[in-house]
Design a protein with these regions (language model features):
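N-terminal Lys/Arg-rich, disordered targeting/topogenic segments
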Residues: 1-2
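Hydrophobic ligand-binding cavity/cleft-lining segments
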Residues: 5-79
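Hydrophobic transmembrane signal anchors and adjacent membrane-proximal interface regions, especially
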Residues: 9, 81-83, 152
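A generic structural signal for short, solvent-exposed coil/turn residues
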Residues: 21, 45-49, 83, 102-104, ...
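Beta-strand/loop substructures that line and gate deep hydrophobic ligand-binding cavities in soluble
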Residues: 33, 93-156
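Hydrophobic/aromatic beta-strand elements that line small-molecule binding cavities or substrate pockets
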Residues: 53-55, 78-82, 106-115
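Short strand-connecting beta-turns/loops that link adjacent beta-strands
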Residues: 60, 86, 115-118
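Short, hydrophobic/aromatic-rich segments at coil-to-beta transitions
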Residues: 83-92
Length: 156
């Protein structure tokens, strides 16, 4: 009985600690950085699944933009809503873990925010509007994709 209680309390404590970091809502960003308004936020004002990912890069925005141009290629050019050089790319995206033929009903922005002349914050925000069971599935997909998102950001 004591071992079971210890395990349960450890799991609850771990879950609380994880939730306190903002996971899975945000990774690599402070709460104030995640609260910044980004392009595309008004395209889906009723979004109830909002996920922010970020990493500070020791390079100016122009260099980061060039690297993104070499490694980033959307699967379908029609999903791109707007491109502002050295600032952001805004696109339509399907919900995480959605079937391949699912409509791109959400938005995703990849924004470059200068922290200093030689340091840039790469901020990725994904927004979806989902209800009921679908919302739970989207959050499950977000949580499952979080580790790969973090790995991708670190590889940049």
């Amino acid at each position: 009985m004591r071992l079971r209680t210890l395990v349960c309390l450890s799991l609850v404590g771990g879950a609380c600690a994880l939730a306190a970091t903002g996971f899975p809502r945000r990774i690599g960003l402070t709460a104030s950085q995640a609260d910044v308004s980004l392009p595309g936020d008004l395209l889906l004002p009723g979004a109830n699944v909002v996920v922010d990912r970020g990493i500070a890069i020791d390079a100016p925005a122009s260099v980061v933009w060039d690297v993104l141009g070499h490694v980033f290629e959307p699967a379908d050019e029609a999903t791109i809503i707007e491109i502002a050089d050295e600032d952001h790319v805004l696109m339509h995206v399907a919900a995480p873990a959605a079937p391949e033929d699912a409509p791109a009903s959400g938005t995703c922005v990849i924004a470059l925010l200068p922290l200093s002349p030689s340091r840039t914050l790469l901020h990725i925000r994904e927004r979806h509007e989902a209800h009921g069971r679908e919302r739970a599935l989207v959050w499950a997909g977000v949580a499952a994709e979080s580790l790969s998102s973090l790995s991708m950001l670190r590889d940049l």
